[in-house]
Amino acid sequence: MDSLHAPWRIEYILAPKSPLRDASLFTQIAQSSDDEANHVLARDRTCYALLNTYPYTGGHLMIVPYKQVPDFNGLTDDELCDLLRLTRRCQNALTRVMKPDGFNIGVNLGKVAGAGILEHLHIHVVPRWLGDTNFMPVLANTTVLPEALGELAAKLRAALAQPSDPSDPFDNAH
């Protein structure tokens, strides 16, 4: 099994962590109106999508409920459905814009599972390509991202503005 090395994330890992606070980073972003600076890609009724500032690969994004909860148990069925619908929309937008060979989509619940923001549930969507476990991160402590976050965010916002499937009544593209 190949490993996906992401040593550039060490900056995030080693950064001082604030103790649990009333408003998580994701809640602060949700309440901000500066979507461009925060790399917010789409906002739905109960959740939003944003690019990860410390990505494992280009296009690594997260789907976050507006409600700050540590796990799925804090969401209503409607909120959970909205979260998964936006995840699907983002996967489809990434497919159209970046044409990956596959995806890792998942959730880290709890510190031992790798959660970086314990108090706020979020879903990771990580596009993958054949051979994306290259030597650059291992030998040069360098990640190769094909384009700047702002440029990629603009492309993904445009893709998310289009329905993934025009016949799907549950596709909430605006």
Name each region found by the language model.
Residues 52-54, 66-68, 108-110:
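Histidine- and/or cysteine-centered catalytic micro-motif in compact active-site loops
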Residues 98-111:
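A short glycine-rich, hydrophobically flanked beta-strand micro-motif that places a catalytic Asp/Glu
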Residues 60-65, 114-134:
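Histidine-centered divalent-metal-coordination microenvironment in nucleic-acid enzymes
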Residues 76-100, 150-157:
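Long, well-ordered alpha-helical scaffolding segments within enzyme catalytic domains
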Residues 1-58, 63-64, 170-174:
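Active-site microenvironments that recognize anionic phosphate/pyrophosphate groups
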Residues 62-84, 139-145:
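Short histidine-centered catalytic/ligand-binding loop motif
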Residues 3-19, 128-174:
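C-terminal helix-cap and adjacent tail motif
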